C-alpha cells in the first residue's frame, strides 16, 4: 500500500486500485497537513482504508487550480468537445461498472443490485449532459431597426459542490454533468462516510480527456472542508445536497462571503397517498419501494403513507406482509434488498426516532428493532396509530421507517400531505385521473409521482418546495444553475445626439 493508492479486494472478489489522495490539478496528492481518516464498512463496522483529509489550505489549493483552468485554456474548449469528454467519462463508468458498484456496496452498504442501478444512472446522466453541451443558446431580441440585441449563456466560473453519502457516485454525476457541460470548473467534496467511489471516478478524469484543474475531488469533513468551500471568496457558486440544517449554514456562509450563487437539494418528509380506488397490489409494491429503497436513505422517500379509510385495514395487513419479505443482509448478495445504514451515527439516530415513536404511543406494526448483532442493520419498520403532530411524522428520519395514517377524503389528504415544513416529493395512487391531477396540483412538492414512486429520471427536473431546497437538479433546468445571462446591445444606427 502506498500513501496515495491501496489495493482492495471486495467481498465479491473484485480487486482494484483505490485512490486515497486528494485529486487536485489533475494529480492525486497528500493533504497539506498530512491528516487521514478511516472509512468504515457499515456491514461489519470495520475500517476499509484511510484516505487523505482536506483542510482549508487544501480547499484553497483546489480552488486555485480550478480558477487557473477556468481563466486559461478551458474557456477555449468548444462546447462539442466538452460534450465528448462527458460522453467518454460515461463510457468509462460503464466499462468499470463492476468495480464502481462493488465500491458502493462496500463503502455505502447498499445492495450490489441497487448499486449497479446507480452506476447506470450516473453514466446516463453524464451522457445526457454531454449531449446538452453544444445546445445551450441565447436569444436575439428585436427592439428596433437600429439595435442588435442578443443574450449569451456564460459559465458562472468555479463551482464548489458538496455531495451526500446516500448516493455517492450518482450525486457526483448529477453535480459534475451540468457544471462541465456549461463550461465551469469544479471543486467537489465527497461525503466523509463514503469517499471511495468519488475518488475512483476522479481516477478516470484524465482518461476522459478532461484537462487538469477542471475537476478537483477532495475528501474531508463538512465542518472543515465543506465550510471552507461555502465561505470561499473565489468560489462563484456552491451546490449542496444534504440536510436542511446544513443547507441553512451553507446559505448563510454564501451570504456572508461573496454572495455566491447557491442551489440546495435538502430534506423531505414526503406523503405517499393511497385512495380507495387504487390498484392495491400496485400501491403496496410502490409504497414498499418508496420507503425501503436504499434503506430509507432517500431525501424523497415516501416516509408518510396516507391511506383512505375504506381500504386502511386491508392496506396495513398487506404492507406488513410485504415489508417482512424484504431481505435485509449482506449487500453483496444479489437478492438483498436492504443493506445496513451508512454509519453508527445514522444507526443511532434512526433507533432514537423509533424509540420516540414508541414512547409517543404509535404502534409498531412491523420491525422496530436492530437486525442482527453486527453491522448497522435495522429492521424495516412500520408505525401505525400516528398523528400528524408526532415527531416521527414531522421530522426526516432518513431510514427504513414509515408511518401510516388514515384520511377521509381528497381535502383531508391534501391537508395532511402539506402539513410538514418540507416539500420535496409526493406520491398519489388512484385510478381517477381527476383526483390525480387535482391532488398533484394542490400538493406543495417539487416532484409528484402518480401510481409509482421513487422513479427519478435524469431528463426530468428534481428539487423541492418550502424547506426542501432552492433550485433544481437534473433535466435542462439544472443547466440554469450553472450559467449566467449576459445581454449585449449593439448599436447599428448613428450617434444618439
Swiss-Prot record:
InterPro entries: Ald_DH/histidinol_DH, Ald_DH_C, Ald_DH_CS_CYS, Ald_DH_CS_GLU, Ald_DH_N, Aldehyde_DH_dom. It catalyses: an aldehyde + NAD(+) + H2O = a carboxylate + NADH + 2 H(+). It comes from the Eukaryota. NAD(+) binds at residues 242-247. The keyword Iron does not apply. The record marks 166 as: Transition state stabilizer. Pathway: Alcohol metabolism; ethanol degradation; acetate from ethanol: step 2/2. One of its GO terms (biological process) is ethanol catabolic process. Keywords: NAD, Oxidoreductase. Belongs to the aldehyde dehydrogenase family. This is Aldehyde dehydrogenase. It comes from Aspergillus niger. The lineage of its organism: Eukaryota, Fungi, Dikarya, Ascomycota, Pezizomycotina. The gene is aldA.
Amino acid at each position: 500500500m502506498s500513501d496515495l493508492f491501496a489495493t482492495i479486494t471486495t467481498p465479491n472478489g473484485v480487486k482494484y486500485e483505490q485512490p486515497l489522495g486528494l485529486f487536485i490539478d489533475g494529480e492525486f496528492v497528500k493533504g497539506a497537513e498530512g491528516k487521514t481518516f478511516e472509512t468504515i464498512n457499515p456491514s461489519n463496522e470495520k475500517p476499509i482504508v484511510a484516505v487523505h483529509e482536506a483542510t482549508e489550505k487544501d480547499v484553497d489549493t483546489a480552488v486555485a487550480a480550478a480558477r487557473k483552468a477556468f481563466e486559461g485554456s478551458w474557456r477555449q474548449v468548444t462546447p462539442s468537445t466538452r460534450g465528448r469528454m462527458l460522453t467518454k467519462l460515461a463510457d468509462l463508468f460503464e466499462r468499470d461498472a463492476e468495480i464502481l458498484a462493488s465500491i458502493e456496496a462496500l463503502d455505502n452498504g447498499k445492495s450490489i443490485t441497487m448499486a449497479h442501478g446507480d452506476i447506470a444512472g450516473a453514466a446516463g446522466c453524464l451522457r445526457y449532459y454531454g449531449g446538452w453541451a453544444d445546445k445551450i443558446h441565447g436569444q436575439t431580441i428585436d427592439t428596433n431597426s437600429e439595435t442588435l440585441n442578443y443574450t449569451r449563456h456564460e459559465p458562472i466560473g468555479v463551482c464548489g459542490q458538496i455531495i451526500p453519502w446516500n448516493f455517492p457516485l450518482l450525486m457526483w454525476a448529477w453535480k459534475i454533468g451540468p457544471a462541465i457541460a456549461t463550461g465551469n470548473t469544479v471543486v467537489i467534496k465527497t461525503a466523509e462516510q463514503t469517499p471511495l467511489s468519488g475518488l475512483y471516478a476522479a481516477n478516470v478524469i484524465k482518461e476522459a480527456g478532461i484537462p487538469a484543474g477542471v475537476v478537483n475531488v477532495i475528501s474531508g469533513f463538512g465542518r472543515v472542508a465543506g465550510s471552507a468551500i461555502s465561505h470561499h471568496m473565489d468560489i462563484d457558486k456552491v451546490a449542496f445536497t444534504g440536510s436542511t440544517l446544513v443547507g441553512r449554514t451553507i446559505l448563510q456562509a454564501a451570504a456572508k462571503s461573496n454572495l455566491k450563487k447557491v442551489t440546495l437539494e435538502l430534506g423531505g418528509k414526503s406523503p405517499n397517498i393511497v385512495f380507495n380506488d387504487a390498484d392495491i397490489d400496485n400501491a403496496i409494491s410502490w409504497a414498499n419501494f418508496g420507503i425501503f429503497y436504499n434503506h430509507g436513505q432517500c431525501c424523497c422517500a415516501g416516509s408518510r403513507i396516507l391511506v383512505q379509510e375504506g381500504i386502511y385495514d386491508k392496506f396495513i395487513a398487506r404492507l406488513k406482509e410485504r415489508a417482512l419479505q424484504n431481505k435485509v443482509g449482506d449487500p453483496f448478495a444479489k437478492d438483498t434488498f436492504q443493506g445496513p445504514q451508512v454509519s453508527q451515527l445514522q444507526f443511532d439516530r434512526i433507533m432514537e426516532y423509533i424509540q420516540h415513536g414508541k414512547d409517543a404511543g404509535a404502534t409498531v406494526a412491523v420491525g422496530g428493532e436492530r437486525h442482527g448483532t453486527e453491522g448497522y442493520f435495522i429492521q424495516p419498520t412500520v408505525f401505525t396509530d400516528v398523528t400528524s403532530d408526532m415527531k416521527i411524522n414531522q421530522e426526516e428520519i432518513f431510514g427504513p421507517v414509515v408511518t401510516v395514517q388514515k384520511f377521509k377524503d381528497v381535502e383531508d389528504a391534501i391537508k395532511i400531505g402539506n402539513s410538514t415544513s418540507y416539500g420535496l416529493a409526493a406520491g398519489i395512487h388512484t385510478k381517477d385521473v381527476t383526483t390525480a391531477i387535482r391532488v398533484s396540483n394542490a400538493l406543495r412538492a417539487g416532484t409528484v409521482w402518480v401510481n409509482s414512486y421513487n422513479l427519478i429520471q435524469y431528463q426530468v427536473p428534481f428539487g423541492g418546495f418550502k424547506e426542501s431546497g432552492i433550485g433544481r437538479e437534473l433535466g435542462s433546468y439544472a443547466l440554469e444553475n450553472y450559467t449566467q445571462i449576459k445581454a449585449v446591445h449593439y448599436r447599428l444606427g448613428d450617434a444618439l445626439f
